[in-house]
């Protein structure tokens, strides 16, 4: 997929993997790059605009935990301005198993609600043109880090949700794939809490093993976007990009 002149919405684009992915995206000569984030980062926005002044970059304050109706209001404003949006990237996430409800609200429920909201504008059953969704998940969605079971479960939920979105594409016209980074050196993983403090050194232990940089992850993220494979489960680990096969152990037959 050629990203030239595409309109992209990126939720949580200004930190860690999100920011390095944004740096790569603006190099692809997007037409409009719409950033939705809870906190504005003027320095990061200025940097992105400097990388490629031809890309129209806009920022909207957005908290993924708001009700679906609020998400629809913001998206309507964006669609009214741009007329079309090609890609939605859902990237909001936290890693803190002390905050159980907030972890689920941001990592899973917020992503589902944002996706539900944009279907109002994309769903071909409503006359929409369809669209593409890239959901940032995690390799912990395949195999949990058992010391952070809440985070891992939230990411497994997103992998499952994304797989279902992809299978619904013939009905909705909206395709989807998941982006699953391995352990990446970002502020998110430098300090975080295990569930019930079962392993106080969990962050230290993880970072003692081979990792990847957020720059490597961002580069491979954009390669996955350009590959544009509906239903793909992308693993971005140790600087590599690989589409993995999901093992089926049961089928609903519907």
Curated annotation (Swiss-Prot):
Q: Where does substrate bind?
A: 138
Q: Does the keyword NAD apply?
A: yes
What are the record's GO terms for cellular component? cytoplasm
SUPFAM superfamilies found in the cross-reference section: NAD(P)-binding Rossmann-fold domains (SSF51735)
Which Enzyme Commission number(s) are on file for it? 1.1.1.1
Q: Which residues bind NAD(+)?
A: 10-33
Which enzyme class, named as a word? oxidoreductase
The reaction(s) catalysed by this protein are:
a primary alcohol + NAD(+) = an aldehyde + NADH + H(+); a secondary alcohol + NAD(+) = a ketone + NADH + H(+)
Complex formation: Homodimer.
Spell out the PANTHER family in the cross-references.
15-HYDROXYPROSTAGLANDIN DEHYDROGENASE [NAD(+)], ALCOHOL DEHYDROGENASE-RELATED
Q: Which family is it part of?
A: Belongs to the short-chain dehydrogenases/reductases (SDR) family.
Q: What is this protein called?
A: Alcohol dehydrogenase
- State the species of origin: Drosophila lebanonensis (Fruit fly)
């Amino acid at each position: 997929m050629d990203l030239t002149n595409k309109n992209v919405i990126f939720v949580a684009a200004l930190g860690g993997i999100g920011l390095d992915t944004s740096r790569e995206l603006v190099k692809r000569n997007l037409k409009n790059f719409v950033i939705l984030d809870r906190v504005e980062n003027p320095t990061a926005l200025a940097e992105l605009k400097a990388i490629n002044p031809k890309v129209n970059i806009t920022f909207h304050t957005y908290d993924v935990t708001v009700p679906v109706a609020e998400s629809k209001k913001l998206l309507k404003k964006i669609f009214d301005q741009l007329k079309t949006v090609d890609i939605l990237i859902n990237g909001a996430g936290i890693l803190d198993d002390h905050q159980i409800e907030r972890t689920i609200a941001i990592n899973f429920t917020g992503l589902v609600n944002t996706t539900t909201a944009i279907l109002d504008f994309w769903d071909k059953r409503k006359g929409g043109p369809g669209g593409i969704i890239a959901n940032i998940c995690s390799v912990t969605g395949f195999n949990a880090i058992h010391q952070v079971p809440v985070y891992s479960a939230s990411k497994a939920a997103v992998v499952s949700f994304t797989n279902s979105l992809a299978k619904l594409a013939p009905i909705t016209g909206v395709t989807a794939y998941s982006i699953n980074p391995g352990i990446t050196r970002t502020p998110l993983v430098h300090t975080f809490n295990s569930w019930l403090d079962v392993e106080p050194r969990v962050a230290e232990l993880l970072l003692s093993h081979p990792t990847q940089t957020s720059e490597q992850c961002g580069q491979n993220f954009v390669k996955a976007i350009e590959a544009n494979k509906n239903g793909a489960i992308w693993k971005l680990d140790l600087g590599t990009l690989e589409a993995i096969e999901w093992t089926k152990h049961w089928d609903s037959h519907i």
